Amino acid sequence: MKHYFVDTNVVIDMLADREGYADAACELFDAAGRGEVHLSICALSYSTIYYILRKYAGKENAISSLRDLTDYVSILPVDAEVIRKALYSEFSDYEDAIQHYAALQDASVEGIITRNIEDYRYSDIPVLLPTEFHK
């Protein structure tokens, strides 16, 4: 089974039902629910997702969505090493750098799924769009 790290924006696309992006994100998480792929996100993503979802759906719905999310993903830690590597990386987006180095901590991660391919141009592992995970 393929193992992918999912960028925060893709998770938010699904949970916030973002027009134009939600369908591909839902397909990815549906595949995880069927046991066809294994998905991971980093611990830091939870606070970002909560902050954004709370604005759309309120605190209770945001927390409920995050609880449900734990059924679909493994949560990778963000430790001092990840932070240091991200701070000194060539990534233009610091949050993406953190996610990248969190993903690298798990050798079984085969790719990062994001809508922002360009932000991961310095990635050490393959980067895919949400529509490409099943290819």
Regions found by a protein language model. Name each.
Residues 1-41, 54-61, 122, 128, ...:
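Short, well-structured N-terminal submotif of metal-dependent ribonuclease cores
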Residues 9-10, 44, 81, 118:
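Alpha-helix/helix-capping structural signal
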Residues 10, 16, 51, 96-102:
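Hydrophobic side chains within alpha-helical segments
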Residues 12, 47-49, 119-121:
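Short, active-site-adjacent cap segments at secondary-structure transitions
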Residues 19, 26, 44-48, 52-74, ...:
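Active-site-proximal, substrate-binding regions of enzyme catalytic domains
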Residues 31-32, 69, 106:
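Hydrophobic helix-cap positions at the C-terminus of alpha-helices
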Residues 71, 123-124:
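Short, structured coil segments at secondary-structure junctions
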Residues 74-117:
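Active-site neighborhoods of divalent-metal-dependent phosphate/nucleic-acid chemistry enzymes
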